[in-house]
């Protein structure tokens, strides 16, 4: 009876871990690297040269920041973009924008859609209604997910091993007393 209950718990834990890994972190991760600044990161499976960030303020004003600048083109000093490759992540390319702290704004990562640049496709979106929605930057979103999954899997394996040892001992004791 105990074995059946524990096995169900382990199966549920493993299914939760698989769901987390399959989902990845395709959404946006928002944090504040220092006071007055905001960092938004989006994990993608493919890197493309046609990416840009769009910030829509509550006043209706739009700001667009290219992720990749041409060599002759100057970048924006107020908004900084960053890309890095994460080898252990579900979606290996992390695109980030560091911008002045903005409340009541919507931030989107967009890609030009179509052969001739007509239209756009939204890859990530984040709404910033209050300061409570922003946390301090500690661990990258994908690494945090990876650590959580590893911790859950490790706990599951240790629990299963301990249960197996306990079960084998109880079976051995019962069979010894039954034989005598």
From Swiss-Prot:
Principal subcellular localisation of the protein: host cell
InterPro entries assigned to the protein according to its UniProt record, in alphabetical order: HHV_UL121
TM helices/strands, residue ranges: 143-163
Keyword Signal: yes
Protein localization: Host membrane
Swiss-Prot/TrEMBL keywords: Host membrane, Membrane, Signal, Transmembrane, Transmembrane helix
Keyword Nucleotidyltransferase listed: no
Membrane topology listed for this record: Single-pass type I membrane protein
Gene Ontology CC: one annotated term: host cell membrane
One Pfam family hit: DUF2677
Signal peptide range: 1-27
Protein family according to the UniProt entry: Belongs to the HHV-5 UL121 protein family.
Protein name per its UniProtKB record: Membrane protein UL121
Gene, per the UniProt record: UL121
């Amino acid at each position: 009876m105990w074995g059946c209950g524990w096995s169900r718990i382990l199966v549920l834990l493993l299914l939760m871990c698989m769901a987390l890994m399959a989902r990845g972190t395709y959404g946006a991760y928002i944090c504040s690297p220092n006071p007055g600044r905001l960092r938004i990161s989006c994990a993608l499976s493919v890197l493309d040269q046609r990416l840009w960030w769009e910030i829509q303020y509550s006043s209706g004003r739009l700001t667009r920041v290219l992720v990749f600048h041409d060599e002759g083109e100057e970048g924006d000093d107020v908004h900084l973009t960053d890309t890095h490759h994460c080898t252990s992540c579900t979606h290996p390319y992390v695109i980030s924008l560091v911008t002045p702290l903005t409340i009541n704004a919507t931030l989107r990562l967009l890609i030009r859609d179509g052969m001739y640049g007509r239209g756009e496709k939204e890859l990530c979106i984040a709404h910033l209604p209050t300061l409570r929605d922003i946390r301090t930057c500690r661990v990258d979103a994908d690494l945090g997910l990876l650590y959580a999954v590893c911790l859950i899997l490790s706990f599951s394996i240790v629990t299963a091993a301990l249960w197996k040892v306990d079960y084998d001992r109880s079976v051995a004791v019962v069979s010894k007393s039954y034989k005598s």
